[in-house]
A protein has these predicted regions:
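Acyl-donor (CoA/ACP) binding surface of acyl/acetyltransferases
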Residues: 1-24, 31-33, 39-154
């Protein structure tokens, strides 16, 4: 699998972006970049597997106050195939390579599910309940930098 940056000027007519999911994500990011800015590498990414887009992931903006939030999404028909875990791993890697001091966070709906399990596998720990403009009450997770993450095991 690979990541492909969702750029400011994607050609929505490309065959690669033909699915309804891709079109929706492209529209979301078109608006989202106007809100958060387009500052590499703190952007959105498509997840590619065998030249097919199977999900997306990204940062919710540039680091602020030494923290950056990650998010990931697997298209429904590809769930359970390790795509979200791959996305989480890659975003952690990008953040650490860009700024090893940045604190990496994530938010989830307030219930245990596949996403919370992925975060726990990557050594994120629950911090507190916070408000999120999309979710409402959300669980805030913070990557525990005191623990070593072995990407081979995740």
């Amino acid at each position: 699998m690979d990541l492909k940056i969702i750029s400011l000027s994607e050609d929505k007519t490309k065959e690669l972006y033909g699915s309804e999911d891709c079109q929706k994500i492209l529209s979301i990011y078109e608006d989202y970049y106007q809100k958060i800015g387009y500052n590499l590498p703190w952007v959105g990414y498509f997840v590619l597997r065998e030249n097919q887009i199977v999900g997306c992931c990204g940062f919710t903006g540039q680091p602020k106050d030494g923290k950056v939030e990650i998010a990931y999404y697997t298209f429904k028909e590809f769930e359970g195939q390790g795509i979200a875990s791959f996305s989480c791993k890659e975003l952690i890697s990008i953040a650490n390579q860009t700024d090893p001091t940045v604190i990496i966070t994530a938010k989830t709906v307030p219930e245990y599910n596949a996403s919370t399990k992925i975060l726990q596998n990557f050594r994120f720990t629950f911090s507190e309940i916070v408000q999120d403009e999309e979710i409402g009450d959300a669980w805030l997770w913070i990557l525990d930098t005191g623990k070593t993450v072995s990407f081979d095991q995740c």
